């Protein structure tokens, strides 16, 4: 894990994830479903390696992900030994329509623990759009994930379902484990203007920025800064603020309890663009 080296970088944190699983379970499909980022591997001269970058927004911080897929090659051990250096997370992928790919998870986990012990992992059941051909019951996969102590997702690159959500959850686990979430120390050198904006939006909700006695251009910048950077500390402390006016016409901020958003996507998510039977 690393932070950007200059304020001009387009991300706040950089994480390296490995996609691991048998061949033909759809790992390349997952990478191809990502529209942003580079697709050409810096090590394209090595066969059997797929590579993609993408940037996600996590608690207001921009997290750039480097995603590596070894494509289940027989020389996985040699490749993984090289690519596991500096890896912060592993995505275990199986095909829900291929029983053999699920039963091979123990073999992959053993190799991961041999070369990268203790690296955070999530279990991903791919090709949910083929649920009518399902060979791995969701309940069985969920029980297996609970036994491993990892988070479980079923995803569909075709429907763009749970792809970003699964990456975001693994990034959250990694950042919290290393205590590098946005409540920690600043991840880059800020300009004076950004420091001023950080101070203001840290105690002012975005919907109250319009009420501040500031020029309209500055208020607009503050709102954009607040939404893009996610610097409103109330989201992590479980607090919100409301503007109250006393009888002396002086405004003040008072704290109001709010419910923090769940760390995993809801089960009734309808973001997918196709019907899953």
Swiss-Prot record:
Q: Where is this region: Switch-I?
A: 41-49
Instruction: Provide the protein's localization.
Output: Cell membrane
Lipid-modified residues of type S-palmitoyl cysteine are: 269
Q: Which Pfam families match?
A: Ras (PF00071), SOCS_box (PF07525)
The coenzyme or cofactor needed here is:
Mg(2+)
Q: Which residues carry this modification: Cysteine methyl ester?
A: 274
Q: Where does Mg(2+) bind?
A: 28, 69
Keyword vocabulary terms for this entry: Cell membrane, GTP-binding, Hydrolase, Lipoprotein, Magnesium, Membrane, Metal-binding, Methylation, Nucleotide-binding, Palmitate, Prenylation, Ubl conjugation pathway
EC assignment: the record states: 3.6.5.2
Query: Where does this protein act, in terms of pathway?
Result: Protein modification; protein ubiquitination
Q: Give the GO terms filed under biological process for this record.
A: exocytosis; intracellular signal transduction; protein ubiquitination
Matching entries from SMART domains are given as: RAB, RAN, RAS, RHO, SOCS, SOCS_box
* Lipid-modified sites (S-geranylgeranyl cysteine): 274
Q: What influences the activity of this protein, per its activity regulation comment? A: Regulated by guanine nucleotide exchange factors (GEFs) which promote the exchange of bound GDP for free GTP. Regulated by GTPase activating proteins (GAPs) which increase the GTP hydrolysis activity. Inhibited by GDP dissociation inhibitors (GDIs).
Q: Which GO terms describe its molecular function?
A: GTP binding; GTPase activity
Topology of this chain in the membrane? Lipid-anchor
Domain SOCS box, chain residue ranges per copy: 175-228
Q: What is its main location?
A: membrane
Quaternary arrangement and interactors, per the entry?
Component of the cullin-5-RING E3 ubiquitin-protein ligase complex (ECS(RAB40A) complex) composed of CUL5, Elongin BC (ELOB and ELOC), RNF7/RBX2 and RAB40A.
Function recorded in the entry: RAB40A small GTPase acts as substrate-recognition component of the ECS(RAB40A) E3 ubiquitin ligase complex which mediates the ubiquitination and subsequent proteasomal degradation of target proteins. The Rab40 subfamily belongs to the Rab family that are key regulators of intracellular membrane trafficking, from the formation of transport vesicles to their fusion with membranes.
Q: Which NCBIfam families match?
A: small_GTP
- Protein name in UniProt: Ras-related protein Rab-40A
Please give the organism: Homo sapiens (Human)
Highest classification ranks of the organism: Eukaryota, Metazoa, Chordata, Craniata, Vertebrata
């Amino acid at each position: 894990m690393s932070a950007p080296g200059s304020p001009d970088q387009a991300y706040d944190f950089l994480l390296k994830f490995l996609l691991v699983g048998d061949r033909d379970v759809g790992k390349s499909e997952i990478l191809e479903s990502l529209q942003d980022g580079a697709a050409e591997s810096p090590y394209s001269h090595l066969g059997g390696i797929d590579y993609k970058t993408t940037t996600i927004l996590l608690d207001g911080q921009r997290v750039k992900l480097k995603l590596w897929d070894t494509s289940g090659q027989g020389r996985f051990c040699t490749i993984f030994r090289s690519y596991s250096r500096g890896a912060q997370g592993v995505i275990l992928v199986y095909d829900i329509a291929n029983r053999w790919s699920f039963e091979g998870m123990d073999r992959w986990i053993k190799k991961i623990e041999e070369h990268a012990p203790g690296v955070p992992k999530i279990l991903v059941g791919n090709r949910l759009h083929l649920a009518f051909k399902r060979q791995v019951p969701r309940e069985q996969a969920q029980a297996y994930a609970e036994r491993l102590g990892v988070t479980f997702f079923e995803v569909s690159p075709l429907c763009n379902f749970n792809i970003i959500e699964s990456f975001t959850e693994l990034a959250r686990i990694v950042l919290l484990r290393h205590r590098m979430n946005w409540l920690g120390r600043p991840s880059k050198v800020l300009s004076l203007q950004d420091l001023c904006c950080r101070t203001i939006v840290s105690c002012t909700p975005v919907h109250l920025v319009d009420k501040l006695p500031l020029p309209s251009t500055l208020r607009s910048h503050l709102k954009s800064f607040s939404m893009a950077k996610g610097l409103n500390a109330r989201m992590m402390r479980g607090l919100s603020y409301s503007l109250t006016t006393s009888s002396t016409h002086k405004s003040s901020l008072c704290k109001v309890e709010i419910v923090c958003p769940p760390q995993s996507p809801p089960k009734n998510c309808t973001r997918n663009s196709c019907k899953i039977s």
